[in-house]
Regions:
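Nucleotide/phosphate-binding catalytic cleft detector across ATP-hydrolyzing
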Residues: 1-17, 21, 25-71, 76-200
Length: 200
């Protein structure tokens, strides 16, 4: 891993707080952390407030890291994050279920979602359960003999309009969003910064 990839930048946006972080993935330490609590009168989608927060912190992070921020992971907590569970049931014509068969099934699920929700960008695709011949499994086991295969998948997505607005703001700093993360999902499933950096 080169030095440039050892540093990850995160921007967190929620109804009550903005946060920006610089994380060293090699030494597993947070090098910079700045958060601002938004008062009840502040609309967290107020772009002027977000721009001011970025103005106050981007240069400090760049000075600390010795390089420009080009990419950032965006952690978004918003009621507008769309959640959808879908199930896919398939007849398996092979002797057993392979990893490749699973991957193809997940691609099919993703395609189904995109066909139905054109204005949404998938940020998380979570497999909740697998069913092999009607038996539920929480973890995928390869090469099990199987005639009937089913998946229960949870999609988390945000609208392309929100993506467009956030990209426009960050373009002013020549920063691209590398990945979007659902803040509620992150809080629920990742105990610390190390686990989060491994996910991203």
């Amino acid at each position: 891993m080169n030095k440039e990839n050892e540093l990850q930048n995160y921007l967190s946006i929620s109804p009550d707080k903005f946060g920006i972080y610089l994380f060293d993935t090699k030494n597993l330490t947070n090098l910079y952390k700045e958060e601002i609590i938004l008062n009840n009168d502040t609309n967290y989608q107020n772009h002027d407030e977000l721009k001011k927060f970025l103005d106050d912190n981007i240069f400090k992070i760049e000075k600390l890291s010795g390089k420009f921020i080009e990419n950032i992971f965006l952690i978004l907590e918003d009621k507008k994050i769309f959640n959808l569970e879908i199930g896919i049931k398939k007849k398996n014509y092979n002797i057993s279920v392979t990893k490749e068969y699973l991957e193809n099934s997940l691609v099919e699920a993703k395609d189904l979602f995109r066909e139905s929700y054109h204005n949404q960008e998938i940020i998380h695709m979570i497999v909740n359960k697998y069913f092999i011949n009607g038996k539920m499994l929480l973890l995928f086991e390869e090469n099990l003999k199987c005639e009937n295969f089913a998946l229960e998948v949870n999609f988390k997505s945000i609208s392309n309009d929100i993506i467009y607005d956030l990209n426009k703001i960050l373009e002013n700093y020549q920063i691209k969003i590398s990945k979007y993360l659902d803040g509620s999902y992150v809080k629920k499933n990742f105990k610390n910064d190390i686990e989060l950096s491994e996910m991203s």
